[in-house]
């Protein structure tokens, strides 16, 4: 990850990105698409890389741009702006590489800004407005709102077979 991602916002406490068990805090990687700020739990993120060449996959899900190679492994790339139906004029320049239940997948985003330490009291459940199943929470920052996304739901939409595995692991 870039140096700008290693800085965490804390209340005067700079412990880094690892938290003690039992705290009422968690950390998110904040990123943007269009004019909207989103977050993903840092525990699901393996790394953030700059956009890399992609190999198209015939008959892939419409959200999949193709495959990219990372350290010799082919990883599917989800076009997150397309998946979220967010209009943007900027060219996405970062890939958030995630690992969720041993399944690696990359998410194309416009810009990754930083890591934040968040108190659970600063997060609210997502309001029930339309189909918001991809948003699990709203985080209120001083000058903006960050939408915490449910990446498991996005993966399940793309690949129902993976959904069965995710459901099995959770039981």
Each model region followed by its residue ranges:
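An acidic, low-aromatic, low-complexity terminal/linker signal
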Residues: 1-171
């Amino acid at each position: 990850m870039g140096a700008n991602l290693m800085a965490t916002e804390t209340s005067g406490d700079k412990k880094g990105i690892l938290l003690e068990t039992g705290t009422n805090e968690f950390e998110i990687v904040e990123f943007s698409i269009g004019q909207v700020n989103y977050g993903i739990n840092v525990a699901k993120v393996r790394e953030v890389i700059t956009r890399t060449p992609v190999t198209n996959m015939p008959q892939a899900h419409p959200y999949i741009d193709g495959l990219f190679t990372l350290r010799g492994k082919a990883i599917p790339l989800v076009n997150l702006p397309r998946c979220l139906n967010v209009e943007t004029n900027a060219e996405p320049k970062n890939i958030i590489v995630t690992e969720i239940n041993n399944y690696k997948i990359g998410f194309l985003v416009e810009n990754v800004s930083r890591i934040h330490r968040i108190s659970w009291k600063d997060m609210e459940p997502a309001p029930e407005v339309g189909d918001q199943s991809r948003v699990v929470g709203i985080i209120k920052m001083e000058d903006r709102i960050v939408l915490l996304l449910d990446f498991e739901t996005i993966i399940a939409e793309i690949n129902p077979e993976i959904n069965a595995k995710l459901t099995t692991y959770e039981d």
